[in-house]
Amino acid sequence: QFGWIRFMTNRQAAERILSLIDLTNLNDVCTDEDIVELCTRAHGEFGTTAAVCVWPRFVDLSASHLKHTSIKVATVVNFPHGGTDVAAVVDSTLAALDVGADEIDVVLPYQSMIKGDEASVVSMLQAVREIVHAPDHLKVILETGELSDQGIIRRASELAIKAGADFIKTSTGKTKVSATPEAVTTMLQVIRDSE
């Protein structure tokens, strides 16, 4: 799948890879100055990142700073604990979109997934999908380190894709175990099988 990289110079490969990733600051003590620096860093020597990902309280500042660029503003909802309050997640999503978010990264209610409560998972993901319309993107964070079992990771990936996720992601980076090669392999297999 990544054979294209063999035909590129190092600079071309760096530019291509950079254009596919988010530059993120979800530090708990993040400041306005940190966000301005993040937005500035998103324009690098080798091009620009796809997006910056920030706390909801910084969406407006980021959107303002990146207004005349192709860089998208992503934010997180239901983050980092993956709760089950659909109404709160919908409200957070609407508020973020209203102030300029282009991408919503929602944490899947992973405790529900662990308990086998797929209906709660689907309900939340569908509710968010209903309000995140193209060209905006919906990304679903599975929190694979908490799911741990590859069968559950597979099923969570399937549910997210079926609910209309544009992207699936491994983790929040806020748990003891984040991305693992096994989880990534499982997720990639589900993506492949869904095409």
Task: Walk through the language-model features, giving the residues of each.
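Alpha/beta enzyme core
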Residues: 10-47, 57-195
